[in-house]
């Protein structure tokens, strides 16, 4: 969607997945991962919270091995330990607000302050219709800095030139620092509208990167910034890693909560262990010193 009317959208590593029921051992393995690598990284609530319904994730994309690098047989043995770290992503699809919708689930868009929209969670494999409005929430338990790159994807598998859609000075004044419980929402007070001038448009490919230090090659602008395709390709090759994906059971269709609004829209708090969890967790198996890099699909109906 090149630099659309405010139509950007989410990320596109397309996972080839088969969703099936997990046996108890698989469920327990998945629970240990998201419990220790994501939930327990958040702070505990300062005041006791009402007991909530038990929740869990199902694994929908098994670990995908990173391709072997050239001359791998000649490489020296790895010294640094490789471990899994998670990045949480919730894709929200906006719909017209109904009278019964909770007030905190509603949003007035910057470009249309007369109409209210309600945010509903969708799973990462959702296929969108042209013109759908979406927002993103991203959370990283790793302390660091968040970067989000958008590219249009076409039916022949090719991609448009990359654009940095976060950070920008219009969103949080360019502050892209992340930590457990801190939610970054995109775009600031608007929504991405999925559309393109090209007939072979197939959706968006969003690349999400979490680094320990700010990227020296990136200059944050007032708005979206065009990036050098060769630079992005180098990052993707250099930080490629094995990835697993988990979906929150029963999460799709749930609306925005008061806690999510305060953390994401207002930035007045962080989420705790008692608050809602992301709809989708991406588990990246990489060396601790490497940035985390994932892609998330926003696919369109053909």
PLM region spans:
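Secretory-pathway glycoprotein ectodomains that are cysteine- and/or Ser/Thr/Pro-rich
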Residues: 20-302
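N-terminal secretory signal peptides that target proteins for export/translocation
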Residues: 1-3
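Bacterial N-terminal signal peptides
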Residues: 5-16
């Amino acid at each position: 969607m090149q630099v659309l009317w405010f139509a950007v959208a989410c990320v596109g590593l397309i996972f080839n997945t088969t969703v099936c029921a997990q046996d108890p051992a698989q469920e327990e393995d998945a629970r240990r991962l998201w419990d220790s690598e994501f939930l327990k990284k958040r702070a505990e609530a300062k005041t006791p919270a009402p007991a909530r319904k038990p929740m869990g994730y199902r694994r929908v994309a098994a670990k995908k091995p990173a391709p072997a690098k050239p001359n791998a047989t000649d490489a020296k043995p790895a010294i640094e330990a490789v471990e899994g770290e998670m990045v949480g992503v919730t894709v929200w699809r906006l719909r017209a607000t109904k009278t019964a919708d909770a007030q905190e689930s509603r949003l007035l868009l910057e470009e249309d302050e007369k109409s209210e929209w309600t945010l509903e969670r969708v799973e990462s494999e959702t296929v969108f219709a042209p013109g759908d409005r979406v927002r993103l929430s991203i959370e990283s338990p790793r302390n660091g800095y968040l970067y989000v790159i958008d590219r249009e994807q076409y039916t022949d598998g090719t991609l448009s030139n990359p654009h940095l859609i976060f950070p920008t000075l219009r969103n949080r004044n360019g502050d892209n620092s992340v930590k457990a419980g801190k939610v970054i929402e995109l775009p600031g007070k608007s929504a991405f509208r999925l559309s393109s001038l090209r007939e072979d448009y197939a959706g968006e490919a969003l690349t999400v990167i979490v680094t320990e230090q700010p990227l020296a090659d990136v200059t944050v602008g007032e708005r979206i910034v065009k990036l050098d395709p060769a630079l992005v390709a180098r990052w993707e090759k250099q930080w490629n890693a094995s990835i697993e994906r988990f979906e929150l059971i029963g999460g799709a269709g749930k609306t925005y909560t008061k806690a999510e609004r305060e953390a994401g829209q207002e930035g007045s708090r962080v989420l705790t262990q008692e608050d809602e969890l992301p709809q989708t967790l991406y588990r990246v198996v990489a060396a601790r010193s490497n940035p985390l890099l994932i892609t998330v699909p926003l696919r369109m109906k053909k």
